[in-house]
Amino acid sequence: MINRTSIIKQPDKISFFYDVYKLQKEYQDSLISGKSNMNFIWLGEHQLCYTVGRGSNMDNLLFSADEQDVFKIDRGGEVTCHMPGQLVTYLVLDLSNLNKDLNWYLRKIEKIIIKTLRSFNINCSTKDGFTGVWIGERKIASIGIGCKRWVTIHGFSINVNCKLENFNKIVPCGIKGCQMVNMSDYNKNVDIKEVKKIVKKIIHEEFNFNFVSE
């Protein structure tokens, strides 16, 4: 029988990136080893930091790595930036119980983001040849995942009302000339707590999960 139960954490405070990364790894290891059969979802915000995916071009970091918090992690994709005002969602899911297809999973994440933004009357779409979600030529949401023995890690981020100038220190997602935007550029009254509620609701709709607090 497929377990559709997911532990969910939604901290209100800013969370240190590496602490949450270690937490994801613990849940991933528990699913792989069979110690747990529950998925894990985390929604929140990080302190200002930069993360670098597997095989990233370090030239896309436009500063010395000792000037800011930089984390090299086990996800696909290039360098990106996290900060307050950006909603980050991590999904540690056992795809063996859903669909053992990473392309399907990436399209599912894009769908969750697009449905979320459209709930706030923000028209957006995917872009051929690129991951993430875009408004024209501007990028509003980034995706980066890892997967080990069909158990996923990492997830996606949506710029809600963050300080976009922090992206000037990198080549976002390795795309030269990429311009990042906020939800607040299109909906001035957007609130990150409301965005979090909508993301949770749509994840429930798309995966048919039952959420429990640990």
From Swiss-Prot:
It catalyses: octanoyl-[ACP] + L-lysyl-[protein] = N(6)-octanoyl-L-lysyl-[protein] + holo-[ACP] + H(+). One of its GO terms (cellular component) is cytoplasm. One of its GO terms (biological process) is protein modification process. Residues 35-211 form the BPL/LPL catalytic domain. Pfam families: LplA-B_cat. Its main location: cytoplasm. Substrate binds at residues 75-82, 142-144, 155-157. The active site is at 173 (acyl-thioester intermediate). The record marks 139 as: Lowers pKa of active site Cys. Pathway: Protein modification; protein lipoylation via endogenous pathway; protein N(6)-(lipoyl)lysine from octanoyl-[acyl-carrier-protein]: step 1/2. This is Octanoyltransferase. The gene is lipB.
